[in-house]
Curated annotation (Swiss-Prot):
Keywords: DNA-binding, Nucleus, Repeat, Transcription, Transcription regulation. Residues 1-116 are annotated as: Disordered. GO terms for molecular function: DNA binding; DNA-binding transcription factor activity. This is APETALA2-like protein 2. Belongs to the AP2/ERF transcription factor family. AP2 subfamily.
Amino acid sequence: MLLDLNVESPERSGTSSSSVLNSGDAGGGGGGGGGGGLFRFDLLASSPDDDECSGEQHQLPAASGIVTRQLLPPPPPAAPSPAPAWQPPRRAAEDAALAQRPVVAKKTRRGPRSRSSQYRGVTFYRRTGRWESHIWDCGKQVYLGGFDTAHAAARAYDRAAIKFRGLEADINFNLSDYEDDLKQMRNWTKEEFVHILRRQSTGFARGSSKFRGVTLHKCGRWEARMGQLLGKKYIYLGLFDTEVEAARAYDRAAIRFNGREAVTNFEPASYNVDALPDAGNEAIVDGDLDLDLRISQPNARDSKSDVATTGLQLTCDSPESSNITVHQPMGSSPQWTVHHQSTPLPPQHQRLYPSHCLGFLPNLQERPMDRRPELGPMPFPTQAWQMQAPSHLPLLHAAASSGFSAGAGAGVAAATRRQPPFPADHPFYFPPTA
């Protein structure tokens, strides 16, 4: 007999406790039925109907095939392998955006784009809140002006690029937008065209004026000055209430020093060039002007001053002493009385000048007249007369730019007059005047 657990009875398909006994002997068993006899033993689920016909013989069809049942649950689906740690995860939306992004053809440029503007040659300055336009020419950056909008600054750059580099220049807009400018810029030089662009701007972003040579001073007024002229860093022209006045002052100075070809803020024809003074004469006058804070000494070689030279020869204790010449103006009162016979006379009002002769040190100390010994003529001054002089002498000449008033000089002169004159016994030699 063969016991097959994979085949279940058609009547008890839902019961799992049925057993099928298959007899391999075709002629064995009771009942006299032909074919294979099948005996079913239902031990767990029994009913009265089943008990009555428990001895009945049933005929079951032969199994046509083997059925395999899954006893264990199926395994879960395998998870996708994680991305490596060095590769960041990419989203599907980003991949789709990259795939749909159109490829823009880049225009050939000579330099990088501006970091703060989409236009070439335009830069935004946060400190001033203005848009500045620049262009490179011969390795130098040329300033074109400050503007309120980036569009205006870009147009200024385009005009300068066409002027500097021709029709093949890289510009921000179409070349057809500048047809009118092409006709006008042919008659101008590069420097003149740059100044025209600056005048059309809304003001200098780094300075405070759109005019050349004009800046806003700290005091609130407009300062005009010229730079790099006559070897100086700049020349100060003055302060003005309005920037137009300062610009016109700069124009007049530029025409005065550079001629009719000077670059000005306004048209040179609006100025009377013939009435302007010559720059060469002013340069000479400025060169002779001495504003140093020092004591002025009389100049014997000055042909402009009307002075008379009076010779005063003093005998000093040094054998190498030289003659001393004192200059006396013609208009002032004579301080040394000189006769035609050249006789020595005591001075009435002394006026001292610094001298290189060490022996010319007068004794200004008061002495009683009765105690002074009677001395004859001495060829050389005594040692006491040399050493008893004060270390500093009052000087009546002051510098023109020192700022001292005339009253102070008069006080010093009065104090000098109260001092006694030179000793009468000191010999003076007055050479005859021509």
